[in-house]
């Protein structure tokens, strides 16, 4: 059995990243860990976020013998990566908002970043804008409600389009031609976002870039024999771990439809979060 790729998020948003990784690495085993007991992360204090995430991920890495960790959460990536890399001995990949490609793609030089309040307010985000989009007018939009709406869509199959239109009204009024989806939950709402914003706004996320980075790192750390063995691997292991006491039937169905054969609640021992 190969060492799995561990994808981590606060909720179901990381499934959008997982899907991109599986396109490039279809024969690999995967673990999906989501800390839905503390969702949404954009509302947490930094130290609480760091201690909780590191304890939880470290516990699952030790249990699953993961080969690599993908922190498929923009909010966590902006604060947790240094502590996580100091704790783990395996590669850790984070999510970077697609500011650079957005600036390159924009014709009007008016772009937006839609993310959680935590991502929007952090210095790291402003550094990205200064470094890669200094020739653009950049509007920042923070919303935790959209995270919960994405979770609700997966759990129930329903979405309040009237409320979504209200939430997105400042973006419509901003007259942008490119919008960066700076939260991995938001690609789950891509069709609905496009419907409200119109075809004149291009939506960008980081899923494909993350997948390419994961493939590169695995190639650097594995021998040719290991790669060939995994390519021939047919009985894929797909495990999902969550932290909330219960998950909805709709979410469980979604995970099973994604190929997960094991769904298990996990609790942290050393976390103060």
From Swiss-Prot:
Keywords: Cell shape, Cell wall biogenesis/degradation, Isomerase, Peptidoglycan synthesis
Binding site for substrate: 9-10, 41-42, 74-75, 184-185
Cited NCBIfam families: glut_race
EC number: 5.1.1.3
Lineage of origin: Bacteria, Pseudomonadati, Pseudomonadota, Gammaproteobacteria, Alteromonadales
Calcium listed as a keyword: no
Official protein name in the record: Glutamate racemase
Reaction(s) the record says it catalyses: L-glutamate = D-glutamate
Metabolic or biological pathway, per its Swiss-Prot or TrEMBL entry: Cell wall biogenesis; peptidoglycan biosynthesis
Source species: Shewanella sp. (strain ANA-3)
